[in-house]
């Protein structure tokens, strides 16, 4: 989502609060909870899940392994839920032609660098760079090349933009910033 005027362009960045992340966190939580229940029921010899008899799974080695997978899955699920709660990766890119300043803001993990705020002068922007890798794991990324700073990604790699959409966005941004486009 973005907002534009004649001299200001604001690009809002979706962080980790995406539907796919909610689905993965929920599925992982339920699956790991199931593994932990099966491991616990095999240890105690009681039937917590009525799909099968607890005597069918011996605690050593199957019950131990299932308990381990359940605990590991719960930790990963907890990590996913925390990133969703903190909305890691969200923020905005603000391009202001009047002031000649570019501001990039992202939310990070809690701590000292929770708020990631970058500021550049527009005259330091060398180019807008598109990196396209086709194949099994296709990757399309839009970078802003800054003099003395290197390349800063503007679009996340997990967003599934087509090559045409990336090119369109790069052309609009390069025209707005009055810088050239590089393709790699």
Curated annotation (Swiss-Prot):
GO cellular component terms listed in the entry, alphabetical order: chloroplast thylakoid membrane; photosystem I
Domain of life according to the entry: Eukaryota
Principal subcellular localisation of the protein: plastid
Keywords: Chloroplast, Membrane, Photosynthesis, Plastid, Thylakoid, Transmembrane, Transmembrane helix
Topology of this chain in the membrane: Multi-pass membrane protein
Membrane-traversing stretches: 22-42, 57-77
Subcellular location: Plastid, Chloroplast thylakoid membrane
UniProt-listed InterPro entries: PSI_Ycf4_assembly
GO biological process, one term: photosynthesis
Function: Seems to be required for the assembly of the photosystem I complex.
Family: Belongs to the Ycf4 family.
Listed name of the protein: Photosystem I assembly protein Ycf4
